[in-house]
From Swiss-Prot:
Domain of life, per lineage: Bacteria
Organism, as annotated: Escherichia coli (strain K12)
Miscellaneous comment in the UniProt entry for this protein: The operon is cryptic under classical laboratory conditions, but is functional when constitutively expressed.
GO BP, sorted A to Z: cell adhesion; cell adhesion involved in single-species biofilm formation
Keyword vocabulary terms for this entry: Signal
Signal sequence segment: 1-22
Identification of the protein by name: Uncharacterized fimbrial-like protein YehD
Family membership: Belongs to the fimbrial protein family.
Length: 180
């Protein structure tokens, strides 16, 4: 019996000392786990670049208009649709504007080569101005499983409290497709 008590005391002191040293280590472990899924949605070749050709308007159409007013009688629409395909049925497909053509202080305005006139952008026939500062949902433009065709339209936008300047009003936007 005496030997078993001594053996128990030796074993318990051994395990207790191991616990004391376990807290005083100078290294740790970081484990990173990931998963690679199917390719994300992509712009289709030939449908990855579209244009809106705006009608020419005189500077006088902006006289008396406040800053961030649109000229509603000149609406430009895309010549064709921006086309996106997904490898399988996915939910939450969105587009994001990833260029610096946004106007600070107005999440919906798009800058141009003309400091006094820019654009508001719209999706399809929607009359709500597109918030270009955040990803926008394109689910309602689905044409088939995993296929999307997105029409855009634009209106001229006055960007100044003063008179607008004549000249080109160019803007080039880069968009990224993503999914939730």
């Amino acid at each position: 019996m005496k030997r078993s008590i001594i053996a128990a005391a030796v074993f318990s002191s051994f395990f207790m000392s191991a616990g004391v040293f376990a807290a005083d280590v100078d290294t740790g472990t970081l484990t990173i786990k990931g998963n690679i899924a199917e390719s994300p949605c992509k712009f289709e070749a030939g449908g990855d670049s579209v244009s809106i050709n705006m009608p020419t308007v005189p500077t006088s159409v902006f006289e008396g208009k406040a800053k961030y007013s649109t000229y509603d009688d000149a609406v430009g629409v895309t010549s064709s649709m921006l086309k996106i395909s997904c490898p399988k049925e996915v939910a939450g497909v969105k587009l994001s504007l990833i260029t610096n053509d946004k106007i600070t202080g107005n999440d919906k305005a798009i800058a141009s080569s003309n400091d006094t006139v820019g654009y508001y952008l719209y999706l399809g026939d929607n009359s709500d101005v597109l918030d270009v500062s955040a990803p926008f949902n394109i689910e309602s433009y689905k044409t088939a499983e995993g296929q999307y065709a997105i029409p855009f339209k634009a209106k001229y936008l006055k960007l100044t409290d003063n008179s607008v300047q004549s000249g080109d009003v160019l803007s080039s936007l880069v968009m990224r497709v993503a999914q939730d």
